[in-house]
């Protein structure tokens, strides 16, 4: 997996940061997933090497404008500029009414299949939001002024390295059967032998996981969702000194994000959703927030627009 940050500011865009959006690249399936879609997200696509035509799923955390105002325009542009096979949207209950209202009142036609899925029940009952043979997405409710949800996208474990020399020793004919054996499946050959693919593969390879958590004040549900994740993307709207403001507005400080990362045992923390008050030249800057978080969770990085982060299996 590779994560590309398209917007890392909270509330409003700044000269250096757009509002919230994160792209998850899935090169093995030529797909792109989007987490939140603040105003101007489609413009961010034009400034990097992401291909809008690969967009397959969009996960919305909550219905505040800095997380959803870019969605109608992006979906409309996708219909005009590509041959999309369809997009699935996941989010809070009002997402459907919001999107259908905008499309209807603007007489916008989406010329491809568009499905909208409510995540509230799955998040509250700790069930699956999306699953296929390779990936699984779960969600958890957050503590914010409106219903909000964090998401976890995780690759399923994969069969280990296929031992082709051993397969040849067993006189297994090459061809399509090798693909099934590489997946660890059992195959019956033409000569009647049944071969268990797991005996021809090395140790199972763990998948990688990314958790996207915004907007929220510190909450245990986020800690549980992020357990052992390879990358936790967590909002850091305020500095530690602004903790009272964070509780009042139901946002996180840098130290709350770090506490979540530490308690969840994640591998890496990326701070995003930064208040414009921490712009360069101000008394407190984004670098200060990273320093605060790093004192609790050392492997902390600062997200910035167009930053790419490769997410690889832990060794």
From Swiss-Prot:
InterPro entries (UniProt xref): Metallo-B-lactamas, RibonucZ/Hydroxyglut_hydro, RNase_Z/BN
Cofactors: Zn(2+)
Active site location: 66
Binding site residues for Zn(2+) 2: 66-67, 215, 273
Recorded superkingdom: Bacteria
Any one GO molecular-function label of the UniProt entry: zinc ion binding
Top-level EC class: hydrolase
Subunit record text: Homodimer.
Assigned protein family: Belongs to the RNase Z family.
UniProt-listed SUPFAM superfamilies: Metallo-hydrolase/oxidoreductase
Catalytic activity: Endonucleolytic cleavage of RNA, removing extra 3' nucleotides from tRNA precursor, generating 3' termini of tRNAs. A 3'-hydroxy group is left at the tRNA terminus and a 5'-phosphoryl group is left at the trailer molecule
UniProt organism field: Synechococcus sp. (strain CC9311)
Binding-site residues for Zn(2+) 1, renumbered to this chain: 62, 64, 144, 215
Cofactor note: Binds 2 Zn(2+) ions.
Protein name: Ribonuclease Z
Purpose of the protein: Zinc phosphodiesterase, which displays some tRNA 3'-processing endonuclease activity. Probably involved in tRNA maturation, by removing a 3'-trailer from precursor tRNA.
Gene3D superfamilies registered for this protein in UniProt: Ribonuclease Z/Hydroxyacylglutathione hydrolase-like
Protein EC: 3.1.26.11
Pfam families: Lactamase_B_2
Keywords: Endonuclease, Hydrolase, Metal-binding, Nuclease, tRNA processing, Zinc
